[in-house]
Amino acid sequence: MSSDEKLQILYCSFCGKSQHQVRKLIAGPAVFVCNECVDLCNDIIREEEIAQAGGAQKKLPTPPEIHRMLDEYVIGQEFAKKVLSVAVYNHYKRLGNQTKKDSVEISKSNILLIGPTGSGKTLLAQTLAKILDVPFAIADATTLTEAGYVGEDVENIIQKLLQKCNYDVEKAKTGIIYIDEIDKIARKTDSPSLTRDVSGEGVQQALLKLIEGTVASIPPQGGRKHPQQEYLQVDTSNILFICGGAFADLHKIIQRRTDKIGIGFAAEVRPKEDFSREASKLIKQTEPGDLIKYGLIPEFVGRLPIITTLEELDEDALMRILTEPKNALVKQYRKLFEFEGVEIDFREDALKAIAKRAIQQKTGARGLRSIVEHTLLDLMYDLPGVAAGLRKVVIDSGVIDQASPPIFIYHHEKASRKVAQE
């Protein structure tokens, strides 16, 4: 072999093999790498990813553990907790095993929560994100419009998630997004719309790819889009989407399908409470076809394979919500009063009165804080000025019903009723 021929032979800069000893030699700036070294590098990276995923899996709580942790923050809704625990566990188990070579590809299972206002839909989603320590964002479906119209683009949802994790794209890819009021973007009829529906069917169409999995182009640091801008590329394939809505009157669609109640002279006359219980039972029988009749397009329903329902909270559940969870309202107000050196005691009849009022207002658990806040407004206004010598404040049903003032107990004194200055 001549010296000129030797000079023309290229060698891998890593293993030293010549171009004749390997299948492919890739050239770079003054450097060459063979296909064997590339395969070796890929194997090393894959092994590290599997090791990291394995470590993350060890920390992933099992469905019963997720259920128990949900119990610490959310009262009732046992069936919904069970469904969510399994769904979330499978979702993150799937993410942890994506690096393994397998012919079976597991699809993402997004979730639809159906339940009345104040039943705990948002709280369940928030608590799941807290348990799993993943980024979490909430979006309101009623503010979304198609791109190019006044309102929020659907891609703004991803931007909110990025903001929650300081624009760490890799972290955002494993987050949870909760879209509230999803029932409000239902079209008015179950036939395709002939006119432009920018906040209903149009939004459903825009959400399809985002929920299923696409690469969204997001302006960095919340800026507006313009042609010369560099975008952050966010793959939504591994983001878990949980949609929630009240779906008012959905039970009527299910009732017509199941044909449980007669009409006209054949109709059974029942009290209002029975109809409420009947509606709750019917909602549990929700099928994809019922949601399509309600106004969700079939493609959108197909992207939400896991459907679970939440029950309307009764008086007992609302009373437990006031006292039992880790961040219960009563515990929060006790802490607030402790800052002033005063103890506050809510009697059981007061808790019952608060729960009854929330049921009357049809606000569920969401309305509990506003009722307590309104009740204690005057007391909290005057408390800093009268806290000296005050040991305890007792709240009973009379205070909630505004029939009597709180009971003040001073140091070295028996209980006495005092009216807060107004």
Swiss-Prot record:
Domain ClpX-type ZB: 1-53
Organism domain of life: Bacteria
BP GO terms, sorted: cell division; proteolysis involved in protein catabolic process
Family matches, as PROSITE patterns: CLPX_ZB
Residues given in the record as ATP binding sites: 116-123
Molecular function, one GO term: zinc ion binding
UniProtKB keywords: ATP-binding, Chaperone, Metal-binding, Nucleotide-binding, Zinc
Assembly and binders: Component of the ClpX-ClpP complex. Forms a hexameric ring that, in the presence of ATP, binds to fourteen ClpP subunits assembled into a disk-like structure with a central cavity, resembling the structure of eukaryotic proteasomes.
Similarity comment: family membership: Belongs to the ClpX chaperone family.
Name of the protein: ATP-dependent Clp protease ATP-binding subunit ClpX
Organism, as annotated: Coxiella burnetii (strain Dugway 5J108-111)
